[in-house]
Design a protein with these regions (language model features):
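Extracytoplasmic
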Residues: 2-17, 28-93
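A short beta-strand micro-motif
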Residues: 22-24
């Protein structure tokens, strides 16, 4: 049985560096996605040059707002693993 800490385990497979989407959170309120982005930019200066997208999605009838970054070339692995090490949600897909 996987523990809840698994969401913060680093990605071990280097193939994840080719993933083009890095999701930094999923929120019930759009404003929370915007606030999270501002906080992450303060904590991680390398994010200041990035432009996020907030994607509205419906899961089991509930609306969520996903905070994501896109990159055609990937390259998110190192940053995502650093975020996970700091217990910040980060999914590569």
């Amino acid at each position: 049985h996987a523990g809840s800490d698994d969401i913060f385990a680093p990605y071990a497979d280097p193939a994840y560096d080719r993933k083009k989407v890095m999701q930094l959170g999923s929120y019930v309120e759009r404003e929370n996605a915007d606030l999270e982005w501002k906080m992450l930019q303060e904590l991680y200066p390398e994010l200041r040059s990035k432009t996020p997208e907030v994607i509205r999605t419906r899961i089991n009838g509930q609306i969520f707002y996903r905070l994501v970054l896109h990159s055609e070339s990937g390259g998110f692995l190192s940053l995502c693993n650093r975020l996970r090490g700091d217990r910040v949600q980060c999914l590569l897909r």
